[in-house]
From Swiss-Prot:
Main location: cytoplasm
Keyword Cytoplasm among UniProt keywords: yes
Naturally occurring in which organism (per UniProt): Xenopus tropicalis
Domain SAM: 321-381
Protein name, UniProt field: Protein Smaug homolog 1
Domain of life assignment: Eukaryota
A GO CC term assigned to this protein in UniProt: cytoplasm
Length: 712
């Protein structure tokens, strides 16, 4: 955007403000200029006002205490009008006139708040008084009590206002708190501040603080001071995300998140929200031109929204329902391209997806940004194929952590509600959505040893697979494909061993989908149903049904490696390690069998000594069907939180199992006495035996929840 275009845009904004807003905006720009620039502007203004006799008359009246005192006899409407006209013309140092104003202002403010009249005019008067160089710290302290009263009065009907008229008041409010924090009335500024009429300073001047007469307003801060009261008083100020403060130009509806302000000494001046974002993020010098790209509307975090508010005829697709553009500002922010939000604010979703470098170049977008935008849009186009790839990976039984991360990133990108072009396509989609595929459920039913558990598992899996019909979805149906993948993830979560991190990530992802406008009500109902199923199964589903499925058998080798001599036992967060359970059982069984003092081959040590897998209680529990049944019944009900809620103290037992167990059984002694004992050659056979033995010990240990020595 050319400089003249920026000036024209700023002029358009300026014409739409009232006089108080114009004054505040000009002051906020003046704080960026140097002393030479400020003096030049003063000369220009004085030269243009030499022949303005009417202004001279008003200025004389504004500084005459007798005339000001006479206004108390006038009606409130006329007094407010007189104050708005004369108060800005009060000269610093005129104590008598200032006292007269300070007596009159509280009466006007009290009347306006009590009768809910002239609220806007009262806000402007309070803004003038709080930023006027003639008012001292004590004067601003006396007016400070009206800040909250006025805001409380206007907060009730604030939503009905099309513009934020309290912006100028924020400046006065912030100036008061800055003066309270810096009561010594020191500032960086001109030594001859009275001659200038205003007290302007710049961190670029590199001058020592000098006294500012009468404690009047300093217009520049040596640091980017945020517009939040609670942050005042610290050297490193931070915008608090929980507070809402408005810019002096327009309330921002941008999604720009809060940021940290550079670690600089706190100054007296105040800054607008846009100024803070521009200076804090870009780090521009203090004497930078106010119409630079860093402070232009196309560059600020909220520039796009403000530009669209000013131009009522412009189209703001960020606010249109179902446009698919609501998440564009946040998406651009994640790409560090948020300063181009205004460029996208008038585009439709289809226009954005069809952008190319030529179109961006015509909009004066830099080469690097053009390339980055085009690449990012190309990635948006590839989301449908990526979802298909994720679906295949999930069906193959891979790790769910990576697909869940991809889905979390994708849900933050712009997604538009799918609208079928004809009724045949819509009917086709409905048929595809209503066809359940029970591939995993059928396999589970055939392998399950418990018919009741298999029936429950089949029911839940079929519900999760409802969106996963075999008929491919249309290319543009991104929400439908996303929902289908969510169904696949739900299925894998139900048929595999519980993973607390994956389940938590999945539930968070569903919550985002439920609040997303791109998903239909039918899809949201499915997602909500899956959420409830995952939560329910994670809390109360029998362990046997979760362990007998094909998804768990694919992870056998990993679990066996963890059980046999692995130091990384924390990788499995669904079942307690055999060593911890075995040692716990051994402690509460008094039967003692001394082990012959002989050396064992290293093979036996790795198999037997690593986790105490072959202790007497374990063998006894494995050979006792009644005990196994009781253990399975109490496995989940004695511990409603599931195996993930086991206390971490059981891990200490694993550290003790590097030597042979002290207590063992005659069967174990017989095994030790065999001179040629070796690990079986068939790996699946030993895997099955170790797994069965580990599960038996686990179920027996968890079933005894009332025992004080239990691992629960």
């Amino acid at each position: 955007m050319m400089f003249r275009d920026q000036v024209g845009m700023l002029s358009g904004w300026f014409k739409g403000w009232n006089e108080c807003e114009q004054t505040v905006a000009l002051l906020s720009l003046l704080k960026r200029v140097s002393r030479t620039q400020a003096r030049f502007l003063q000369i220009c203004l004085e030269h243009s006002l030499v022949d303005c006799t009417e202004l001279h008359i008003l200025e004389g009246e504004a500084n005459n205490p007798a005339i000001i005192n006479q206004w108390q006899q006038e009606s409130k409407d006329k007094v407010i009008s007189q104050l708005l006209t004369h108060l800005p013309l009060l000269k610093p140092g005129n104590i008598d006139a200032k006292v007269a104003y300070m007596k009159l202002l509280p009466k006007i403010l009290a009347h306006s708040i009590e009768h809910n009249q002239h609220i806007e005019e009262s806000r402007q008067l309070l803004s003038y008084a709080l930023i006027h160089p003639a008012t001292s710290l004590d004067d601003r302290s006396a007016l400070a009590m009206w800040l909250n009263h006025l805001e409380d009065r206007t907060s009730g009907n604030f939503s009905t206002q099309s513009r934020c008229r309290s912006d100028s008041l924020d400046y006065g409010q912030m100036q008061y708190y800055h003066q309270r924090q810096n009561s010594d009335d020191k500032q960086n500024g001109w030594p001859n501040s009275r001659d200038s009429g205003i007290c302007v300073s710049s961190s670029g001047w590199q001058e020592k603080n000098t006294g500012c007469e009468n404690g009047h307003l300093p217009l520049y801060s040596s640091s980017s001071v945020p517009s939040t009261i609670n942050a005042i008083g610290t050297n490193t100020s931070t915008i608090l995300s929980g507070q809402t403060h408005h810019s002096p130009l327009k309330r921002s509806v941008s999604l720009t998140p809060p940021m940290n302000v550079p670690n600089q000494p706190l100054g007296h001046g105040w800054m607008s929200h846009e100024d803070l974002r521009a200076r804090g993020s870009q780090g521009i010098p203090s004497d930078h031109a106010p119409l630079s790209p860093q402070s232009s509307v196309a560059s600020s975090g909220s520039g796009g929204s403000e530009h669209l508010e000013e131009q009522s005829t412009a189209r703001n697709t960020f606010q249109d329902e179902g446009s698919g553009m609501k998440d564009v500002p946040a998406w651009l922010k994640s790409l560090r391209l948020h300063k181009y939000a205004a460029l996208f604010s008038h585009m439709s979703y289809e226009e954005m997806m069809s952008l190319n470098e030529c179109q961006l170049e015509a909009q004066n977008v830099t080469k690097g940004a053009r390339h980055k935008i085009v690449i990012s849009i190309q990635k948006l186009k590839e989301r449908h194929n990526l979802l298909k790839t994720l679906e295949r990976d999930i069906l193959e039984g891979g790790n769910l952590r990576v697909p869940l991360q991809e889905l979390h990133q994708m849900i933050l990108t712009p997604i538009k509600t799918y609208s079928p072009q004809n009724s045949n396509t819509e009917e086709h989609n409905r048929e595809a959505d209503s066809q359940p595929t029970l591939l995993v459920a059928e396999n589970q039913a055939s392998e399950s040893k418990d018919s009741a558990s298999a029936g429950i598992q089949q029911h839940h899996i079929s519900n999760c697979e409802t969106e996963s019909g075999g008929v491919p979805l249309p290319e543009g149906d991104l929400p439908g494909q996303f929902t289908r993948v969510m169904g696949k993830v739900c299925t894998q979560l139900l048929v595999s061993r519980p993973d607390e991190e994956n389940i938590s990530s999945y539930l968070q992802l569903i919550d985002k989908c439920l609040t997303h406008e791109a998903f239909t009500e039918t899809q949201k109902k499915r997602l909500l149903s899956w959420k409830q199923q995952v939560q329910k199964l994670f809390r109360s589903f029998p362990r046997k049904s979760l362990l007998d499925v094909a998804g768990y058998r694919q992870q056998r080798k990993t679990s066996v490696d963890v059980l046999i001599g692995s130091r990384a036992f924390g990788q499995s967060n669904s079942l307690p390690t055999a060593g911890s359970v075995g040692s716990g059982i051994a402690r509460r069984n008094p039967r003692q069998f001394q082990i012959p003092s002989r050396n064992l081959p290293s093979t036996r040590l790795s198999l037997l000594g690593a986790s105490s897998l072959l202790g007497a209680p374990q063998r006894a529990s494995a050979s006792n069907p009644a005990m196994l049944k009781q253990g399975r019944q109490n496995l989940w009900f004695a511990n409603p939180g599931g195996s993930n809620s086991m206390p971490s103290r059981t891990h200490s037992s694993v550290q003790r199992t590097r030597s042979l167990p002290v207590h063992t059984s005659p069967q174990t002694m017989l095994m030790f006495q065999q001179p040629d004992f070796q690990v079986p050659v068939t790996e699946p056979d030993i895997n099955n035996r170790l797994e069965s033995l580990c599960l038996s010990m686990t179920e027996h240990a968890l079933g005894d929840g009332v025992d004080r020595t239990s691992t629960i």
